[in-house]
């Protein structure tokens, strides 16, 4: 039976708007299959062993609800985790707009803006229904200091890579000399004029949103 050192057990929290496929992404990673129908999640937890850069880790994964009325519970979930995966659907502009809300909540609860966060755009298999471009996702992630990938829970595209890269992000925060960024993920290098990027991403974004990027 494999035993794990404390620093080889990593707690991850999956957050995002309702209906974006958080559970589908998680179950695809855990069980290698796609769930078409499931009841709305309040809180589910999973464990899986993974190998990242020749190191074995045990991931404790918390799949959370997206409903606004569960904000108090979400604060508790945030405090219990080391890394975060924020999910939106590329077929839903409103879920993309909510990403910054979830990021702000993490920063508020942990009282730090140096938090390991991976942002992912799910449902890229539904290209005909796409409302958010890859470039928009990439630009917002860079602006807010997050890594970024697009995935398909249905086809398993990039699902394993997302979790592996999130492990690297968490470990880099613990030890900046370890786990160099992979070629598949975006660096956290800020853009020069991030306020213009936010405006380009979504002309409906309020001034309160752009102010965060200006401060970075």
UniProtKB/Swiss-Prot annotation:
Catalyzed reactions per annotation: GTP + H2O = GDP + phosphate + H(+)
A GO BP annotation: signal transduction
GO CC term, one of those recorded: plasma membrane
SMART domains documented for this protein: RAB (SM00175), RAN (SM00176), RAS (SM00173), RHO (SM00174)
Motif segment (Effector region): 38-46
GO molecular function terms listed in the Swiss-Prot or TrEMBL record: G protein activity; GDP binding; GTP binding; GTPase activity
Subcellular location: Cell membrane
Residue ranges the record assigns to the propeptide: 214-216
Lipidation, S-geranylgeranyl cysteine type: 213
Family from the record: Belongs to the small GTPase superfamily. Ras family.
Protein name from the UniProt record: Ras-like protein rasW
Protein source organism: Dictyostelium discoideum
Native organism taxonomy: Eukaryota, Amoebozoa, Evosea, Eumycetozoa, Dictyostelia
Encoding gene, per UniProt annotation: rasW
